[in-house]
Amino acid sequence: TLNSMEGYYCTADLTRFSKDSEKKFGIKQYYKMSGEYRMEMTSPDDVAGNYTVYDGKTVCQYNPRVEGKIIKDVPENKARNELFLGCFIKNYMQSEEVSIAVSKTDESRCTVLEAVIPGENKFTSTEKLWIDNETITPVKLVIYDSEGKEKYIVEYNEFQFNPDFEDGIFNIN
């Protein structure tokens, strides 16, 4: 469950909304509650194979289509971090304004948790997490801007709590 989660692996569909467009991506996420993460892009083709890794100290981006392939010492990116379920859990636990609601989707009944994202960023202000009541796994995570508009939607396809991560999955090469 979320309370006892030490890490997770998932595949998901990510939708990013900007002023007049929306972009969809396939992603894989690997995350440890101690903060290390890896996010791989699986689609569309022009970004497939790109990934970002945080080893606990440094963020590194890898792009197989670029000479040199690796960008080290990437600045911390609040919006990118918020795409991880672990960040939602930390925000939810620390948030003074949280809410819990019940929702019925086409497939199942869900519990919806809402949290405020610290830092007063107008693009990432609040977030909601839908959890399937039967499987107790995340269904989707939505991040809203300060006007309540959807900025990011992560729709989980496959989700695994506390996986055995491959050695080196969070290493920066």
Feature names for model-found ranges:
Residues 39, 78-87, 137-139, 161-166:
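Short, surface-exposed linear segments at secondary-structure transitions and domain or protein termini
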